[in-house]
């Protein structure tokens, strides 16, 4: 059985490792990647074990394959990640963000599970009976947006605050986010 790791959202330093799968004790046969590789330029790729790649011998064609501009952007992104140590920065800033959310969780009982790796973190908002609280999430997201912070909505019930800030985010940026989030959460009814 083949195991494929989809790194479209989680790859390229997002989780405090170059690829999210590196946080676990498994090795995929195939990895698919996109989005962050181009930092806005349209590009995707896949890699595989050599025994799989060696079986791919038929010629193929792709309308969008081999684009030199996107390929150049991908190389520049990889260079930037390495030169600016963004894997480690994601781990450190992600810990700061997650620790800050856990501190808020102790203050606000409507924050349920806080989870994530690196700079891919979620905080679940719940009602007193532990049911999802999408209404609370809507208030928090919209009020934070009015303050200049974009926070995603996630989860089946749309009750999970989804934090995926830029990998270049600073300690001060995260402190500002957490301070504003604290103030907004103090207004949740």
Regions found by a protein language model. Give the residues of each.
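Conserved N-terminal phosphate-binding loop of PLP-dependent enzymes in the Aspartate aminotransferase
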Residues: 1-189
